[in-house]
Amino acid sequence: MAAQRRSLLQSEQQPSWTDDLPLCHLSGVGSASNRSYSADGKGTESHPPEDSWLKFRSENNCFLYGVFNGYDGNRVTNFVAQRLSAELLLGQLNAEHAEADVRRVLLQAFDVVERSFLESIDDALAEKASLQSQLPEGVPQHQLPPQYQKILERLKTLEREISGGAMAVVAVLLNNKLYVANVGTNRALLCKSTVDGLQVTQLNVDHTTENEDELFRLSQLGLDAGKIKQVGIICGQESTRRIGDYKVKYGYTDIDLLSAAKSKPIIAEPEIHGAQPLDGVTGFLVLMSEGLYKALEAAHGPGQANQEIAAMIDTEFAKQTSLDAVAQAVVDRVKRIHSDTFASGGERARFCPRHEDMTLLVRNFGYPLGEMSQPTPSPAPAAGGRVYPVSVPYSSAQSTSKTSVTLSLVMPSQGQMVNGAHSASTLDEATPTLTNQSPTLTLQSTNTHTQSSSSSSDGGLFRSRPAHSLPPGEDGRVEPYVDFAEFYRLWSVDHGEQSVVTAP
């Protein structure tokens, strides 16, 4: 096992070795690439995607999840995802380990990954130094004679290979206890279902220039914490902890803001939170990259992104039939909110000219999935046909919640028609307005599994169906509870009827 791990750490030629690791099917991932908007609202990708993620289950029933947010390229994020898996899933963790052992293994894993990456670029750094020594001193690059162009091109290639860094949030689930290790600005949330709603807790802290503990750490190294907080950015990033980024690791003495430091000010040492016991917990774990919550904060303002995203996930749990679909639906929704805010030209539009890559990982702990989804896919409409909705309320004696199921009838067209979709409410209407800004907050769940009425916003589409059997009327018939009114209305409109036919 040790030889296998050394082989993995020494080789850059096995980028897909983790394909052989079993995936965790109790989790799902959604993602979206970065976007910059032009004046006409069109979005284009500013750079290749730089996020990465992992969700594995080892043979000894240890679960590993991670979301990695890169910058200046994706080499570091890919490296970290590969090497952390090697450091944590090749026998280093097992059920006999105590909490202190797990924390020690996590600290050691991050240390090995950081050192391994910096060692992996040693040759490139040496070549860069050698090439730079061949250039005439004091001459700007754009003024160099043509014979130096090949050297300049090689230097640019080397710079791309060695530049960049990554932030990481990692979760380990072992012996039904949750551990979170964090470097940088990605976030981990634990969302628990309670009698009062959904309790949302951020498990880690953001390592930024706004973090008072981080500012104190930097001040102990001899740096001006007040100036760092005022500037807010260190070499292009708000984070005070990063993996990689050789410029701030090796060259911090040449950076005005960091030059007075007694030792490396930007570190890759993780803060570890846990163990968090999960016995009896119903809910879900959230790992998300900085790009996701920053995009939502840009559109809605700071302070409530955690709660809003948790509420969105809760809503999608009721609608989707897979965890990947849950995560992707939330990412798509945040992306749409951000885009719509920019296009609106409103007060928040100036904060939304672009967003970074967005990644969301959701791990389920027994939270009900797909209660509002149709049990089987609707049949595809025939060519040229149109879908007409028929609404049927659903009631279960085993649940006090009420869920609406919308069936679809496909009718042949008498000409060219565009398939229509009709919804009684928008996704955004399901998100509650929140005012509490504490790290732990209880939301009134939109996906209530005990007391809510999720069909209440559907208005007149649904007739109330009592739980008990209805007695027959004088004509021996039971009052219908299937409402065809919307079906007949749309049929009449499409076929040129002057009056809407009422349901029988």
UniProtKB/Swiss-Prot annotation:
Glycosylated residues (UniProt): S395
Keyword Phosphoprotein: yes
Membrane topology value: Peripheral membrane protein
Organism: Homo sapiens
GO biological process: aorta development; cardiac septum development; coronary vasculature development; heart morphogenesis; in utero embryonic development; lung development; non-canonical NF-kappaB signal transduction; positive regulation of cGAS/STING signaling pathway
UniProt cross-references to SMART domains, sorted A to Z: PP2Cc
Posttranslational modification: Phosphorylated at all three sites Ser-423, Thr-431 and Ser-438 by MAPK14 when cells were exposed to cellular stresses, or stimulated with TNF-alpha, IL1 or LPS. These phosphorylations inhibit TAK1 activation by a feedback control mechanism. Dephosphorylated by DUSP14 at Ser-438, leading to TAB1-MAP3K7/TAK1 complex inactivation in T-cells.
Protein name: TGF-beta-activated kinase 1 and MAP3K7-binding protein 1
Keyword set, alphabetical order: Cytoplasm, Endoplasmic reticulum, Glycoprotein, Membrane, Phosphoprotein, Ubl conjugation
Main location (coarse class): cytoplasm
High-level lineage: Eukaryota, Metazoa, Chordata, Craniata, Vertebrata
Gene Ontology molecular function terms on file: mitogen-activated protein kinase p38 binding; molecular adaptor activity; protein serine/threonine kinase activator activity; protein serine/threonine phosphatase activity; protein-containing complex binding
Record GO cellular component, one term: endoplasmic reticulum
Chain residue ranges for the region called Disordered: 1-22, 430-478
Subunit note: Interacts with XIAP and BIRC7. Interacts with TRAF6 and MAP3K7; during IL-1 signaling. Identified in the TRIKA2 complex composed of MAP3K7, TAB1 and TAB2. Interacts with TRAF6 and MAPK14; these interactions allow MAPK14 autophosphorylation. Interacts with STING1; interaction takes place following cGAMP activation and promotes TAB1 recruitment to the endoplasmic reticulum, triggering MAP3K7/TAK1 activation and STING1 phosphorylation.
CDD domains: PP2Cc
InterPro entries, A to Z: PP2C, PPM-type-like_dom_sf, PPM-type_phosphatase-like_dom
Comp. bias intervals (Polar residues): 7-17, 430-439
Function as written in the Swiss-Prot or TrEMBL entry: Key adapter protein that plays an essential role in JNK and NF-kappa-B activation and proinflammatory cytokines production in response to stimulation with TLRs and cytokines. Mechanistically, associates with the catalytic domain of MAP3K7/TAK1 to trigger MAP3K7/TAK1 autophosphorylation leading to its full activation. Similarly, associates with MAPK14 and triggers its autophosphorylation and subsequent activation. In turn, MAPK14 phosphorylates TAB1 and inhibits MAP3K7/TAK1 activation in a feedback control mechanism.
Site (Required for interaction with MAP3K7): F484
Effect seen on changing F484A: Abolishes interaction with MAP3K7
Domain PPM-type phosphatase: 28-365
Chain positions with Phosphoserine modification: S7, S378, S423, S438
Compartments where located: Cytoplasm, Cytosol; Endoplasmic reticulum membrane
Record PTM Phosphothreonine, positions in chain: T431, T442
Biased composition range(s): Low complexity: 440-457
Tissue-level expression: Ubiquitous.
Xref: Pfam families: PP2C
